[in-house]
Amino acid sequence: MIVGHGIDLQEISAIEKVYQRNPRFAQKILTEQELAIFESFPYKRRLNYLAGRWSGKEAFAKAIGTGIGRLTFQDIEILNDVRGCPILTKSPFKGNSFISISHSGNYVQASVILEDKK
């Protein structure tokens, strides 16, 4: 049974402005594993990756119902499976989780569905 659904839409240029003012912003948002992947990319791909992880984590926080106030970005990790699809590899939710991240032009959108295992 679906117990939560969260959606987030983010302008990539807004993330870029924050990142340009404070490059440590990426360390606040990304886990150690995510940061290693982020650092392997060229600049433009880094921005898309960072914005995608931001949006995915915001969508997760909305789906679980707490928002990012009670969770931190470090409580949530989004990596890719062997096919390159994003998956939630770390979160406080114990059920099944499904995530989709899409980029188009200057926007990134993420959707998270949480499903109870019962």
UniProtKB/Swiss-Prot annotation:
GO biological process, one term: fatty acid biosynthetic process
Xref: SUPFAM superfamilies: 4'-phosphopantetheinyl transferase
Domain of life according to the entry: Bacteria
EC id: 2.7.8.7
Subcellular location(s) of the protein: Cytoplasm
Pfam families reported for this sequence: ACPS
Residues the entry annotates as binding Mg(2+): D8, E58
Single GO cellular component term: cytoplasm
Reactions that this protein is recorded to catalyse: apo-[ACP] + CoA = holo-[ACP] + adenosine 3',5'-bisphosphate + H(+)
MF GO annotations: holo-[acyl-carrier-protein] synthase activity; magnesium ion binding
UniProt enzyme class: transferase
Sorted UniProt keywords: Cytoplasm, Fatty acid biosynthesis, Fatty acid metabolism, Lipid biosynthesis, Lipid metabolism, Magnesium, Metal-binding, Transferase
Cofactor list: Mg(2+)
Family in the record: Belongs to the P-Pant transferase superfamily. AcpS family.
Function: Transfers the 4'-phosphopantetheine moiety from coenzyme A to a Ser of acyl-carrier-protein.
HAMAP family per the UniProt record, alphabetical: AcpS
The protein, known as: Holo-[acyl-carrier-protein] synthase
Source organism per UniProt: Streptococcus pyogenes serotype M1
Lineage, uppermost ranks: Bacteria, Bacillati, Bacillota, Bacilli, Lactobacillales
